Amino acid sequence: MMGKKERYEIILAGSGGQGLVLAGVMLGEAAVLEGRNVVQTQSYGIASRGGLSLAEVIIDREEIIYQQVQEPDIILALTEEALEKYAALAEKGVRIFYDTTLAKPRAGANLTGYPFTKIASDLGNVASVNILSLGAMTAAVPMVKTESLAGVIRKRFQGKALEMNLEALRKGVGLI
């Protein structure tokens, strides 16, 4: 497990509809709750559902001058296309978490695969894959506290969606 750093540059990559932009916003909100500075950007492929979707998050204790990820520390790849795009960065020390449900398993240092989509589906809602994978990432790399993410989830959701997303967060954290 990495020690606590001052700055994290994170890329969340997958396909439109997987909730990665929301995950990036929520990660940023959790960092703000902890008194950190945050920049969050996103881009979409040709189709909002199905095309490559990217969310970038920079978390820093200092002021953030350049607002795009230049040297990612952590990448979440929820599709084969996303993993293909970034897999080579693992050799340069970038920690990559990927979904073995939708991407071919790979061996190598800094490559960590979990069946995020299958677990989310087993929980009863594949849409919770974003929060489940955030739980695993933040448990492995302490960029924000799990309690901060849970607080953001409590502010954004209610009723059954709240319960489901808190359970997805717990399941993700439990993978590590």
Regions found by a protein language model. Give the residues of each.
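Active-site cofactor/cluster-binding pocket
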Residues: 1-176
